[in-house]
Amino acid sequence: MRVTMSLEALTTEALAAIAAAQDLAALDQVRVLFTGKKSQLAEQSKALGKMDPEQRKVQGAAIHAVREAINAALTERQTALQQAALQQKLASETIDITLPGRGQHMGSIHPVTQVQERICQFFTKAGFSVATGPEVEDDYHNFEALNIPGHHPARAMHDTFYFDVNHLLRTHTSGVQIRTMETTQPPIRIVCPGRVYRCDSDQTHSPMFHQIEGLYVAENTSFAELKGLLINLLNEFFEKDLKVRFRPSYFPFTEPSAEVDIMDERGRWLEVLGCGMVHPNVLRAAGIDPEKYKGFAFGLGVERFAMLRYGINDLRMFYQNDVRFLRQFA
């Protein structure tokens, strides 16, 4: 009877210690004290072997009941302490949801690239292929093959970036047309977008700018076909029916040649591109018989089209990396 009473006292003492534990570390110490290998409960379990069977049965059941009560109290207290610790952590790491979020600014395609892709898409729908070539060009493909004589002003040092007497930064993408004609049999229908370089820098000119040139060579081409193609380009690009005029002009690589103007909202004529029928000397230089084939060509400045489309009066704004400006075209 004395042992049974000590179990009751042990239970009372253990439950009080469990309730008094303020954190998980203290609770673990209580667990070891009352249910560990050296605890009073373990000592009493060892004493069962010295009892007669009937007493062992009764006392064993009592010890088991005490152990279950202590373990249940330990589990309940552990859950409570873990929940309290979690609440304390949440309170210390709370997020002020009234603060504005730090949204990420999405990038976008540069307006010049947008315009270039828009123009190329028009021509690919019309059956043209996109062709590219080297930006460091030789004198032959940049000038001589295009019927540009040695005394032409474009060959001057103040207009062209030369590496040496035979190599330069291309001043137009026309060299791509020559290279294509040298390796491809007509019919040829290509557009050639890319960077070009000239010694010029002001409000409407840049040492580096983008150009798109086009070439169509076949047995039956005409200036009327060229005219219709370019008028359709201008109307689709600017999304309106424009007044367009073709002015007689001169380019060494086309004959006849013309410059194309559109009328703005103020009734002023604005030059937008140049064009013409490919000069027989250019066809001959590329190995194409000018008696059998004819062709037309055209060229335009991408930045020029972008400035007209978006109402920008200074080309240099495209290359100042001002995100406030560029974000308008996202």
From Swiss-Prot:
This is Phenylalanine--tRNA ligase alpha subunit. GO terms for biological process: phenylalanyl-tRNA aminoacylation. The keyword Magnesium applies. HAMAP family: Phe_tRNA_synth_alpha1 (MF_00281). NCBIfam families: pheS. One of its GO terms (cellular component) is cytoplasm. Binds 2 magnesium ions per tetramer. The gene is pheS. InterPro entries: aa-tRNA-synth_II, aa-tRNA-synth_II/BPL/LPL, Phe-tRNA-synth_IIc_asu, Phe-tRNA_ligase_II_N, Phe_tRNA_ligase_alpha1_bac, Phenylalanyl-tRNA_Synthase, tRNA-bd_arm. Gene3D superfamilies: Bira Bifunctional Protein, Domain 2.
